Amino acid sequence: MSAHESFWFKSLRWIQKQLVHTIVVPQDPFADLNLDPSRPLVYVMKTESVSDIAALHEITGKLGLPSPYQMLEIDGIKTPRVVCLEGRKPLFGKRDSNEPFLQTFQQLLALHRQQQELDIQLVPVSLYWGRTPGKEDDTMRAAVLEREDPTWLRKCLMILFLGRHNFVQFSRAVSLRHMADEHGTDKRIAHKLARVARVHFRRQRKVMTGPVLPNRQAMFHALLKSDNLKKAIAEEASSKKISEEKARETAIQYLDEIAADYSDSLVRIAERFLTWLWNKLYKGISIKGAEQIRQLHHDGHEIVYVPCHRSHMDYLLLSYILYYEGMVPPHIAAGINLNFWPAGPMFRRGGAFFIRRSFNGNKLYTAVFREYLDQLFAKGYSVEYFTEGGRSRTGRLLAPKTGMLAMTLSSVIRGIERPVTLVPVYLGYDHVMEVATYHKELSGKKKEKESVWQVFGAIRKLGNFGRGYVNFGQPITLQNFLTEKVPNWREEVGEDPEQKPSWLTPVVNALANRVMTRINDAAAASSVTLSSMVLLASEQNALERNQLERQIDLYLSLLKSVPYTSYASVTEGCGKELVDRGIELNKLTETKDDLGTIISIDDSLAISMTYYRNNIIHLFVIPSLIATVMVRHEEVSREELQELVAEFYPLLKAELFMGVTDLPAYVDALVECFKSEGLITGDNRLKLVDDRINQLLLLAGVVGETLKRYAIIFNLLGEQPRMERADLEHHSHRLASRLGAIHGVMAPEFYDKKLYALLSSKLKDLGYLSDKADGDKVRKIRDHANGLLRSSVRQTIIETLNQEQDD
């Protein structure tokens, strides 16, 4: 009988099982790490430990992976399923040598030399009992519980106190066949593997626990000694005619207002609360792209998360997901409005640092904040901030606020050695609890000040909110971005590091636009967003169930056949299943009669559902534009279709932060998908299929409100080509209000003055709005926009314009 089958070992494992709760990273190793169940597998661990292997045994049984106690047998030769770099550490004396590790590796390499078809997967496994990074001023608790290589006595204490926070992390498998073919199979290679594995485990631990936590007061004193803050304090004293000591006290007050006070203990408590909260609120959280972010951390990147901002839940959701995905929750830039009791102190201990909405020319505050941000980057803490500056009230991305991006880029320019990488993050929900409040604010109600009563009120209303979605977009490494935009930026900055480069502002603006585009590139199409997309394009926000299911199936086919990007995600299931989910979430209403079943959006929810549609409208706006062209013209050449789409795309791109890199190829792929779905026929001459016109009409409805806006703007410019930008925004908004009232447009963004301001800015960039504007170009796009509208809508615009001129 082997040792692990003895009564003693089984008893120890049973006791440990009662004390330990294990979280697996990633949650599905087969899918996330591409493990091949048909190939032999060997686990590699850093240190031999009875308790670690017992914890691994419990998890492998649940995941369907081989047990670490099960020997690997190949052609009658048995080898251990687990190899450890280091032997056990005794209570006294030296740890065992790593000779067994080297012998096992040499044996495995020899098997590959003898059998050319053999390919064993080496899977590194890291175990953590708690994730405390330690502090710069180490405590007795840290000395007992936070050692990287504990003795068996310390390990017993760790299991007792930290067993409920046990993490088992699997890493991407290494092919021993590849190692043998590339590097040979002698003893030297076994030593090399050991060195590489040690580096891997050291980096992996840093990713899981993060850098050591600073003493807050010691950090303040260190920051106050920096040259930049000394200079700012002296200038503050001089400009306000106060003593430097008084200015220094003000700087300390600013630091105390701003700085986080991260507590690992609070994070562990919050993890339990948030697990309860998510299980009560959501039926699951869909995550895409976490592995690439783990790899960036592993490679030593300084990570800055830049998510979209839908809800106050965003602060909690991303940190929770990162924690469960084996990464350290970031330090989050939170608005000072959230610094209210008791949430403010808890947010601060959870890693939030607070920022004023406006610095108002306060040079000392600006200097303090910059130095604090530089310190976070220098110490290696990941950071998170919302580039929109506030929560979106319409479901679309807001125009970015560039302040934090500018400060981050300035930190890079001042000489951060490690690569600093922005990670765009798309956050989505089947239900956003603040949506009703957003629409009240858009209709003119004053925004309520955040308070503890709002929090209690929200918790009281907790219910079934469906699923949450966290998609990580394509990262942007800032050093590479700077080189792309300003190839010789290092040389220019080196000449005078204190001088703001002339190119910084346009580069920051370009960076902000790329961040927003890559957030939208990672959008998540869900049951709620797809159902709202279809029903809001129908006449009365209602369709026969079969028709709704077919339309959703069409949209699913478009998204899967012609992916918007590889970072976007599409919910699982078919049209029928997605409609069922919408009904279950009380987003859709089902009405049955003798003729069948009608699915509708209740009138009280119609405006709210535009929010969810807007989350993914950019995924469908070009397919919708193609459908509109086919419905209005019935027959069109492929070349004419390409020209029409290309004409409107710059405006769509600016408004919706779209990132289609090869527009003609994307349009051609969509045309082929339309043909395969039976919506249109032809090759060079494209014709709509009459029997499928209802599906095309519903799809065309997605871009309908957008085309109305463009028609308003270009009809105004057609009448007055040299109209001032402010006048264009004013008259566009007035005309939109009238058009919406007559034709029942209820989407809040249709009346959003900020959207018309954004469009007028882009029109100026494109040459439509200037003293030298090309009148023929303006009239051409006006005629095309008018030609894509229903005649009644077009007539309303023209009559209203004529009436204004008569007045």
From Swiss-Prot:
It comes from Shewanella amazonensis (strain ATCC BAA-1098 / SB2B). GO terms for cellular component: plasma membrane. GO terms for biological process: CDP-diacylglycerol biosynthetic process; fatty acid metabolic process. Coiled coil: none annotated. A motif (HXXXXD motif) lies at residues 308-313. Its main location: membrane. This is Glycerol-3-phosphate acyltransferase. Its EC number is 2.3.1.15. Belongs to the GPAT/DAPAT family. It catalyses: sn-glycerol 3-phosphate + an acyl-CoA = a 1-acyl-sn-glycero-3-phosphate + CoA. The HXXXXD motif is essential for acyltransferase activity and may constitute the binding site for the phosphate moiety of the glycerol-3-phosphate. Keywords: Acyltransferase, Cell inner membrane, Cell membrane, Lipid biosynthesis, Lipid metabolism, Membrane, Phospholipid biosynthesis, Phospholipid metabolism, Transferase. One of its GO terms (molecular function) is glycerol-3-phosphate O-acyltransferase activity. Pathway: Phospholipid metabolism; CDP-diacylglycerol biosynthesis; CDP-diacylglycerol from sn-glycerol 3-phosphate: step 1/3. The lineage of its organism: Bacteria, Pseudomonadati, Pseudomonadota, Gammaproteobacteria, Alteromonadales. It is a peripheral membrane protein. HAMAP family: Glyc3P_acyltrans. It comes from the Bacteria. It is found in: Cell inner membrane.
